[in-house]
């Protein structure tokens, strides 16, 4: 089963992206994505919806 999550910018805290992941995965996801508020690429970490 997959659960929906959001990806939050580590610098400004804005939730910019939404995705899903496997429920059995223990580690948190983190990606380098573009943040329109910061106007640059930053690390986005997994948070609950």
From Swiss-Prot:
Gene3D superfamilies, per database record: Ribosomal protein L33
One GO term (biological process): translation
SUPFAM superfamilies: Zn-binding ribosomal proteins
A GO term from the CC aspect: ribosome
Keywords attached to this entry: Ribonucleoprotein, Ribosomal protein
Keyword set includes DNA damage: no
Record-annotated disulphide pairs: none
Signal sequence annotation: none
Residues spanning the membrane: none
Highest taxon of the lineage: Bacteria
MF term (GO), any: structural constituent of ribosome
Coiled-coil intervals, chain numbering: none
Keyword Lipid biosynthesis: no
NCBIfam families, A to Z: PRK00504.1, PRK00595.1, rpmG_bact
UniProt xrefs under PANTHER family: 50S RIBOSOMAL PROTEIN L33, CHLOROPLASTIC (PTHR43168), LARGE RIBOSOMAL SUBUNIT PROTEIN BL33A (PTHR43168:SF6)
Family designation: Belongs to the bacterial ribosomal protein bL33 family.
Record's protein name: Large ribosomal subunit protein bL33
Organism: Pseudothermotoga lettingae (strain ATCC BAA-301 / DSM 14385 / NBRC 107922 / TMO)
Gene: rpmG
